[in-house]
Amino acid sequence: MEDLTRYEIQDSLFPTDNELEIPTLRLDMQPKSCAIPFVLFGEARRSFKMQGQGTLCFYTDDYRFQTVYEHPEKIVAMQPANIVEPNFSLYDETPIAFGMQQIYKKRWIGRAMQMKGIRVFVDLCCSPKFYKLNLLGVPRGYQSFCTRGYNHQVEHLAFELEIARMVADGRDLLFVCYGGGQPCKDFCRENGLIYVTPVVEVRNRSLRYDKMKEAVAFFGQEISMTALNPKLNDLPRLEEMMGERVEDFSDKHSIAVSERKEATNG
C-alpha cells in the first residue's frame, strides 16, 4: 500500500471573507479549462494516478468519499490538475447547522487543494434551500463551476447557471454539467456549456449495443444480428464512446488535456 504521508496537509485556518470563517477560494487557482480525463472519485483503482492531468469529481454517494476531509492527502495522491469540490449532500431536509458543516468541509478541501497546486471548480449541486449559503467563501469574479445534472430537474440546472453568472460578474464562464441525460445535454448545447457523460452511462450503453450484436435464436438457428443488419457493425465501440464523454458546446474550446501548475502556499 502506498505511503500517503508525503502528501499530508497540515490542519489550517485559511483566510476567510465571511463571519462563519468558511475558507475563501483563490481566484488565481481556478480552472481555465475542463482538463480531461474527467474522473469520478472511487471509480478507478486506489493506486490510479492522474499525473497532473484531468479533473476529479465527487458526484457519487457520500460514503465513498467521506474520509477525504480527514485525509485530503488521498486527493493529492491522485495528482489531478483540477478537482470539483466534494459534493457533501445538502437536501431540503438537511438542518442548516449541519449543512454549514458540509459547506465548510468542501470549501476547506478546495482551498487546501489550491495550496497544493490543484485548481478548483466550485460545486453548485445542492438543494435550493442552500443556494445562498453554498456561495460563502466563493469570491466575486470566480468563473469556474460544476454541478450534477438530473433529467427531471433541468430547472435546477438553469438556476445554478444563473447563480454562476451572477458570481462571475460579467466575466467569461466555465460551467460543467456532469450527467443528467439528454435533457441536460440539450440545455448545455443551448447555453454553450460543457457536458460530461458519466462512465456508468457509457458502459451501460455499450452493453446495450453488445446485446444488439449478439447472435439470436431464430427458428432454432443461431443467426448473427449483423448479418440481418450490417449497420450494427458501425455501432460505436466502448473506447470511442469513452473518448466522447466530455462535450464542449461553448465557442471557447474549453477542454484541455492538462493545466497543472505549482502554487505558493496561501
Q: Locations of the language-model features?
A:
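C-terminal accessory extensions appended to soluble enzyme cores
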Residues: 1-30, 190-266
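Non-catalytic, usually N-terminal nucleic-acid engagement modules in DNA/RNA processing proteins
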Residues: 4-77, 84, 94, 185-187, ...
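Non-transmembrane, interaction-prone segments in cytosolic or luminal domains
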Residues: 27-51, 91-105, 111-114, 120, ...
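A sequence-composition feature that detects small, non-aromatic residues
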Residues: 35, 44, 77, 81, ...
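Eukaryote-skewed repeat-based solenoidal scaffolds used as protein-protein interaction platforms
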Residues: 49, 65-209
